[in-house]
Amino acid sequence: MPSPKLSSLILAPIAAVAFLASCAPSAPGGERHGAASSALTAQARLTACEQDPRVVAGLVTREICAGADIFFRETFEGNGRSCGTCHPVENNFTIDIPFIDTLIDNNPLDPLFIFEQEPELEELETFELKTLGLIRVNIDGYDDLDNKYVMRGVPHTLSMATTIAPDPANGTEGVPVHRTGWSGDGAPGSGSLREFLTGAITQHFPTDLGREPGVAFRLPTEDELDLTLAYQMSLGRTNELDLTQVSLTDPEANEGRLAFLDPARGRCNVCHSNAGANHLDSGLNRNLDTGTRTAPASGTIGAFDGGFGGKDQAEPNLDVIGLGFKHGFGDGTFNVPPIIEAVDTPPFFHTNAFGPDIEGAVAFYISNQFKQSPAGQELEARFGAPIAFPDSDIVKIGRFLRVLSAAFNVDLARQRLDAALVLVNRFHDSSADVQERLMKLADVELDDALQVLAVGGTPLHPASRDRLRLAKAEIAAGLTATRWSQRQGRLAAAISRVKVARDQFGSNITYRLGKGNLMD
């Protein structure tokens, strides 16, 4: 048993700790975090986090803990939304149609749908949030709300430590200092990820569309900006793979790896080096015009999304979709996302118009739409021929990416299960709620891995999928356990099952994971 002193520390009934500990996640689409514009200051959150068992055990820093609390629960005196409203941890930090449909059924008054509940916010979103998963974004400014907006999918917030350093090759050195959002210019001010929070509050949190700070919302403090940044930079993975050293046990997946790397076949590695978001030449994130802008999913005026750099344009400067006249703002380029995380966050690209599976996104790159785009033409000039690969390579590249994604999912699950076991060993039942939350989030990641590995044709790692199902059964049993020792045994068994499943994928698929993955 933990010492009486330690038990009293963890269970201390102070208001701040109760606030932090009372907000467990549930199944996607169910009752979500109790977001509120609280009286907690950043310092109060830091103090409360000193008593979080994950911090006490050294699994998470108090800064990451406090940043997560802001991310998921602080509404900044706005309309009830938090960052977690559109970036739920239970759904890979994004929203999609299945998630939205379930949320409509389970909680139709969720703040995501505030535009249907408050007349003054009717134009905050459009009906396409529910039908296409697209949100309304005034990326080019708020001077013409009726006409100057775009419709975009919600990008996940995973692994941003690897994706936001801008490539000077775009000719935009200086501002923005980070590549954020779908067009790489999503943050106000200097364009930093730190300042992205200010832009998100202004865009998505207001109580009215006048968006006056201090009236429609409050701005974050300097400490809140710092803490939220610390949390976001600790999500997902913090390293890149070396695909030349990776070897996959599934023959078709490994052949897909070779096609991905081969400039005579996929050429994927040029713009998505090591299946990440950075360019091969620089190791930095580059904006590209790949032609996805010419096929929007949306039929509203917001479909005319010109991408990067539209904010300073007084009049439309770009023919976005080939109408013969200028109707969009920007230079046509968009931010390159990491592929490892993209596999289980469909649909794809900023328009949500491609998918539903990763193979659909791969197939886009042999379409005329891509070949005729500036990015496609650049690759043709570089290698002396248009990009071309057979349909069989679409399947193989898809299998390769699915294995990388499943390995990432399994590693996230393992990280959370390991943390839960540390807590049960140290604190026994005194932190059971946190242990169980970690177990539930691990279970969600195992579901993702199983879904990613479930492909048509030749089965992809059937033995691993069996082990993952057994691990899920151990987690389920652990969640119903009445004593810590029972939960301890189930966790150990689940970890063993997960390890065996993961080992069968291949070698050198090594992810370093951020500590923020343990928060919710």
Regions from the PLM with identified roles:
Residues 2-13:
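Bacterial N-terminal signal peptides that target proteins for export
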Residues 23-25:
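N-terminal Sec signal peptide cleavage junction
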Residues 31-520:
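Periplasmic c-type cytochrome electron-transfer domains
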